[in-house]
Amino acid sequence: MRVAVTGTPGTGKTSATEAFERGVADAFVGDGVDEVDDSEVIHLNDHVGTDRLYTGVDESRESLVADLDGIEAWLDERENAEDRKEAETLLVESHLAHLLPADRVVVLRCHPEELTRRLSERGVEKSKASENAESEALDTVLSEAVSRHGTESVYEVDTIDRTPTEVGEAIAAVVAGERAPSAGTVSYLEYFE
């Protein structure tokens, strides 16, 4: 099974999936849930540059333009590699993960004001942080995920007032099938008022 963990930059994808990797999944082992215990996490953004999974450079954003077809082929090849550990579940973490084939899609959400604060702490330019906050308020990633995968495969997780471990536990519940799909449960439209 392939699970996409996605969201606007700053929502906590990397922190939550790192918590998942550190052992959040172990809490589910006693329940006999092999999919959670036997998972592999791919931090996709780490591979876009190193594995040349891009088509060019966007000079205005100072970022690589991801090659989604190339990434899809790379993931398929990686899943089918003979020397790869046999994992029941492949978690793909990236702000682009929802644009790729997946059985389940976890969309992490964060209030735009908190998102702006997090991105500012990272040193992201104010204009870029504002752009991401507006994207979050408009449900951009959620809308794209639902459009591509349908509401029955999308699980929205609000990261406000949750630690990375708690968000990792929510991801583990999705992987284990212990959480119902929940697209459209979070709204930040008041951000524009």
Segments the model singles out, each with a brief description of its role:
Residues 5:
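Hydrophobic anchor at the beta1->P-loop junction of P-loop NTPases
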Residues 37-90, 96, 182:
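ATP-dependent small-molecule kinase phosphotransfer cores
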Residues 102-125, 132:
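Conserved phosphate-donor/acceptor-positioning beta-strand/loop module used by diverse small-molecule
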Residues 22-42:
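Post-Walker A helix-loop "phosphate-sensing" segment adjacent to the P-loop in P-loop NTPases
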Residues 14:
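Walker A/P-loop
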Residues 11:
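ATP-binding Walker
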Residues 147-193:
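NTP-dependent small-molecule kinase module
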Residues 8:
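P-loop (Walker A) phosphate-binding loop of NTP-binding proteins
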